[in-house]
Regions:
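Active-site bordering "gate/hinge" segments
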Residues: 1-223
Length: 224
C-alpha cells in the first residue's frame, strides 16, 4: 500500500456536528420537519451521527434509510430509492432529504423535487465540508449568473490552452446550485456554487483542450 497517497483528516471529528448544524440551519431545517437521511453501505457513520445531532438540536425529526448498495461515481441515473415498497412514498413525505451518494438523473429525485421536497447532497470529506461552507453572497451571485444564462442562446468558450468551442443553448434547463437546500423543490450539493446545463443537441462544435487544474465532472470526476 502506498501510504503517501492516503489523505490524513485534519478536522477535529468533534466539529462535525457543529458543521452539520450550521449547514442544516442554512438549509432552513426547522422544528417539526421530517429529515430523511439516505445512506448506503459505504457512508461515513460519523456523518450520520452528526446529521442526527444537528436535526435534534434544530427540533426536526430524522431517520436513516440505508440502501443495500454501493453507488458508483462513474454511473449516474441508477435508482437507489423506489425498488423497495414504500421507500418512494416515504421520500415524498419528507421535508428535506439528505443523500450521501450521487442521485443525479434518477426518477425518484425528479419525483420528490416535483413535490416540493428539498434535497441536499453530501459526499465530500470532512476537511472539504469545513472549507466549502456556502459563504454570504454566493446564492445571489449564482442566481445572477442563472438569470444571464437563461437569456443566452449562443455561447463561445475559449482558453489560452487552445479551447475554442461554440454551441447553442436553450433546449435544456439551466440548473443552479449555491451550496444549501433552502427552497422547496431545490436540489443542492454541500460545496456547490455554479450553474450548469447542456448544449442543444448537435450544436456543439470546436475543440476542448484540457490543462492542469481542470476537472472532468460527471460521470468521471477526474482531475487534470
Amino acid at each position: 500500500m502506498d501510504h503517501s497517497a492516503v489523505r490524513v483528516q485534519e478536522l477535529n471529528p468533534a466539529k462535525l456536528a457543529m458543521l452539520f448544524l450550521k449547514q442544516f440551519g442554512m438549509s432552513k431545517v426547522a422544528k417539526g420537519e421530517t429529515v430523511m437521511l439516505v445512506s448506503d453501505l459505504q457512508t461515513r457513520r460519523e456523518f450520520i451521527a452528526a446529521a442526527f445531532a444537528a436535526c435534534d438540536e434544530l427540533g426536526a425529526d430524522a431517520y436513516e434509510m440505508c440502501v443495500n448498495s454501493v453507488p458508483s461515481w462513474t454511473k449516474v441515473g441508477v435508482p437507489t430509492i423506489g425498488q423497495c415498497k414504500g421507500t418512494l412514498e416515504a421520500a415524498k413525505a419528507a421535508d428535506l432529504i439528505v443523500v450521501f451518494h450521487v442521485p443525479l438523473f434518477t426518477r425518484w429525485l425528479k419525483d420528490v423535487m416535483d413535490g416540493g421536497v428539498r434535497v441536499l447532497l453530501i459526499i465530500d470529506a470532512p476537511d472539504d465540508l469545513e472549507q466549502l461552507m456556502s459563504p454570504p453572497g454566493l446564492k445571489e451571485a449564482v442566481l445572477y449568473g442563472d438569470g444571464l444564462y437563461k437569456k443566452t442562446r449562443e455561447v463561445r468558450v475559449t482558453s489560452e490552452a487552445g479551447t475554442d468551442l461554440t454551441y447553442s443553448c436553450g433546449e435544456y434547463p439551466v440548473m443552479s446550485q449555491w451550496g444549501i437546500a433552502d427552497e422547496p423543490g431545490h436540489f443542492d450539493h454541500w460545496g456547490g456554487g455554479h450553474i450548469h446545463t447542456f448544449p442543444n443537441e448537435g450544436s456543439a462544435n470546436g475543440t476542448v483542450v484540457f490543462q492542469p487544474g481542470d476537472i472532468v465532472i460527471l460521470p468521471y470526476c477526474r482531475y487534470v
